[in-house]
């Protein structure tokens, strides 16, 4: 049985990866009277007097909504909210296993920015935080911004910030292995969606001055056509040398490659054209931009992917549970 068949078999066996288990003991009529009516009225009254007491008398303090519209799921693209549900359930499992955070999937049947914002804001009183997941750019930037303005709980777009955090952490350690200095490194970020933009912003903030972004059409510059508003903003702080061309041109002489894009788009020849002891984070899922063995054979010093079955996994699972746990 291959891995794909095994994954389907296990998901069919689980019939869902999460469930709700009662924290309250319900063994006697007295237990029932405290957990539900009439005893439940007392915390209701207290919360009605001070809504912040919902964090004390309910599980809200530990509950996170994992929200998607299914428009940018893994490397699969726009597959819809129902098809995104297995990923959201898996995300909730990771929240619980690694942060003891209770997370619930909310897969919404709309791609309208304002409808998503309204839906989440109306549900915000049930949760202590919101994790936005697998929403396509540039709508994800608008949704996050608007929710932060109208909600009084933390709003976190993991595809942006969680990914950026683990990429920076991995690069910091890769620099130690290679002896490279951030000030001298040329960085290429391939993928100009939510993850690529957030990664670039964080690397710039940390002090990497030489970053070139690429998309499906190649190097992004101020003269590139068909850029969205966020990508246009990024041209003001990246590719300051005014490079033009394709991804292969961007990688010539580069020290670091960060891929959040598409499978099998980096060739061994491209890796060989990079500087000595190159660092490659090929994080397209489920198939990376280049397989680790090919990258290493072509001369890369440090290679990471987003997959747990390869060494050096660069995946936001090592960040978001702890971020929400606090």
Locations of the language-model features?
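N-terminal ligand-binding/catalytic initiation module
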Residues: 1-153
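Solvent-exposed alpha-helices and their adjacent loops that cap or buttress functional pockets
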Residues: 12, 55-60, 96-97, 122-124, ...
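Glycine-rich phosphate/diphosphate-binding loop of Rossmann-like nucleotide-binding domains
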Residues: 74, 79-99, 157, 161, ...
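General beta-strand structural signal in soluble alpha/beta enzymes
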Residues: 105, 131-134, 155-158, 189, ...
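A short helix->loop->beta-strand "cap" motif at the edges of active sites that frequently abuts
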Residues: 152-153, 208, 275-279, 300-301
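Adenosine-phosphate binding glycine-rich loop
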Residues: 158-159, 178-180, 284-285, 289-326
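Long hydrophobic segments that form regular secondary structure
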Residues: 243-244, 248-298, 311-312
